[in-house]
């Protein structure tokens, strides 16, 4: 299974959240874990972020099992 990484700027675009809010969610373990890709760089597993977004949509529409 091939997994793609996306950078923080792409996560911001997909979620509409600021960098600070994403970091807050990470700290509170309410967002998919980041992957360290360099000494000062992180990325996220694209499929995990997509699933997280889909879960938020389902929750807002009362579709949670």
What is the meaning of each model-derived region?
Residues 18-20, 25, 31:
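A short, structured beta-strand/loop element
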Residues 32, 50:
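Nucleotide phosphate-binding site architecture
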Residues 1-21, 48, 54-57:
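Polyanion-binding surface elements
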Residues 41-45:
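Minor-groove-contacting beta-hairpin "wing" of winged helix-turn-helix DNA-binding domains
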Residues 26, 53:
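DNA major-groove recognition helix of helix-turn-helix
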Residues 34-36:
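Beta-hairpin "wing" of winged helix-turn-helix
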Residues 61-65:
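Short intrinsically disordered terminal tails
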């Amino acid at each position: 299974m091939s997994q793609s990484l996306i950078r923080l700027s792409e996560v911001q675009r997909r979620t509409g959240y600021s960098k600070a809010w994403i970091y807050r969610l990470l700290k509170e373990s309410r967002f998919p874990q980041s992957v360290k890709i360099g000494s000062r760089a992180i990325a996220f597993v694209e499929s995990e972020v997509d699933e997280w977004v889909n879960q938020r949509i389902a929750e807002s529409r009362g579709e949670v099992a």
